[in-house]
């Protein structure tokens, strides 16, 4: 079965082998570099049916690190299109994971420590920016304190996901995935451990799901019914009082109704 073809909406996969999104931390100002062209071309030569580009920031401030790819500018489409074309030539389907790092933005690259950035990082040429999140609580002691998102910023980020999905289609990606896991922005709205807002986007589980579901709805409307839309979630927080596996099951039923 692994090597049988699979049709998902209008996309035909030659097999069911999927290369998951794996950050390369090798972009410059969010743009594709030679490393990416070599890396993804090599993956396509392996024969996988579906190949995901790494987590790609829908805004510059939504990147995990200075080395993460971005899709917030039309000028970034050209480099991304080179990747999709090379993947397609070798018979695989190109996919992209769209994300916003939220409170975990502006981190060090793994080989520089994988923690919050410091003056050591700026000395090597990286920049530090202010993260945004549902609340103004830092991820942990010593981490950058995020700015609590106002309603206007929710609208801006939602629109950024929409624009990113438009650019993804223009660049030649045939499958789109929204990143809602690992403590990044959309996951942090879902979890009661990171979201204690007192407006319509916090409190009850219905309110905490509201913003992520709004993003899904707008992206689905933008890309149409024929393009497969995936969502990556963390099954549970693994902490008392956090997001549970039962929450995930309920959420997945709702996502399916929304066209995921």
Roles of regions detected by a PLM:
Residues 69-95, 190-230:
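Alpha-helix-loop-beta-strand connector modules within alpha/beta enzyme cores
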Residues 20, 54, 95-99, 135, ...:
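A cross-family glycoside hydrolase active-site/sugar-binding cleft signature
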Residues 85, 93, 99-171:
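Non-globular sequence segments
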Residues 44-45, 88, 169, 253-259:
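Non-catalytic positions within long, well-ordered alpha-helices that form the structural scaffold/packing
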């Amino acid at each position: 079965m692994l090597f049988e073809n699979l049709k998902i909406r209008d996309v035909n996969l030659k097999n069911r082998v999927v290369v998951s999104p794996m950050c390369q931390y090798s972009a410059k100002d969010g743009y594709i570099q030679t490393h990416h062209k070599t890396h993804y071309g090599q993956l396509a030569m392996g024969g996988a049916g579906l190949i995901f580009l790494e987590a790609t920031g829908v805004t510059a401030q939504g990147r995990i690190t200075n080395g993460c790819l971005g899709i917030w500018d039309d000028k970034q489409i050209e480099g991304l299109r080179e990747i999709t074309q090379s993947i397609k030539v070798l018979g695989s389907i190109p996919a992209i994971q769209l994300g916003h790092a939220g409170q975990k933005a502006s981190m060090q690259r793994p080989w520089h420590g994988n923690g919050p950035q410091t003056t050591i990082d700026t000395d090597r040429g990286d920049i530090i920016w202010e993260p945004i999140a549902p609340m103004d609580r830092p991820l942990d002691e010593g981490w950058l304190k995020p700015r609590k998102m106002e309603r206007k910023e929710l609208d801006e980020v939602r629109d950024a996901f929409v624009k990113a999905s438009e650019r993804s289609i223009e660049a030649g990606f045939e499958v789109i995935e929204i990143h809602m896991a690992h403590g990044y922005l959309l996951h942090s709205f879902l979890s009661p451990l990171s979201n204690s807002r007192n407006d319509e986007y916090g409190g009850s589980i219905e309110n905490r799901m509201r913003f992520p579901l709004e993003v899904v709805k707008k992206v689905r409307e933008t890309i149409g019914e024929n393009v497969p839309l995936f969502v990556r979630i963390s099954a549970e927080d693994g902490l008392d009082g956090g997001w549970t596996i039962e929450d995930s099951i309920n959420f997945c039923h709702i996502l399916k109704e929304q066209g995921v």
